[in-house]
């Protein structure tokens, strides 16, 4: 079961590559981390509720030193992957375990970040209209604006449900796409929901 989150990541990576290919041909570009009329939606600040804060009480810090990022995670969560472009922690348990999965993708300096992030937002809004997503918003975490969305509870309790935050940043002179995913299966997501939001809002990253 521990390989299931990797399958989810690969599927998302393929969709990202498709969007990247389209956008690289665009003659309109926004500077990395800049805000244009294309992505000027007002962002909500990522502030945890009391329950979400309590869910992390007595926890630990998950550090991704290679990418200058860190999270607060609950007690007993353990690191499963720490590579240059992928970072994963998870709670105890089988398919109902909670997962933190973070991916970094290096982008060309000319990549149109404003158009891209707006496309992710619009795509999530379309999924919401189609009944696939029940939460979509511009969300600022640690001073960086991105798009957050949450999938609906799956019809089958053992299917996966994801909460994601997508953003672009400049790190060590490199333009990067940041994908922070919190997931579990349908049953586990409800059980771990306060933890998942708490971990997401705790994101610290250099940008």
Enumerate the predicted regions with their spans.
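Surface-exposed amphipathic alpha-helical segments
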Residues: 77, 175-207
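Bacterial signal peptide processing site
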Residues: 18-21
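N-terminal "mature-domain start" segment
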Residues: 43-85
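Secretory pathway targeting signatures of secreted, lumenal, and periplasmic proteins
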Residues: 67-119, 155-158
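Sec-dependent bacterial lipoprotein signal peptides
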Residues: 1-15
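Signature of long, low-cysteine stretches enriched in small and polar/charged residues
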Residues: 121-171
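Compositionally biased, proline/threonine/alanine/serine-rich low-complexity intrinsically disordered stretches
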Residues: 25-54
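Second-shell loop/turn segments in exported
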Residues: 104-111, 136, 185-189
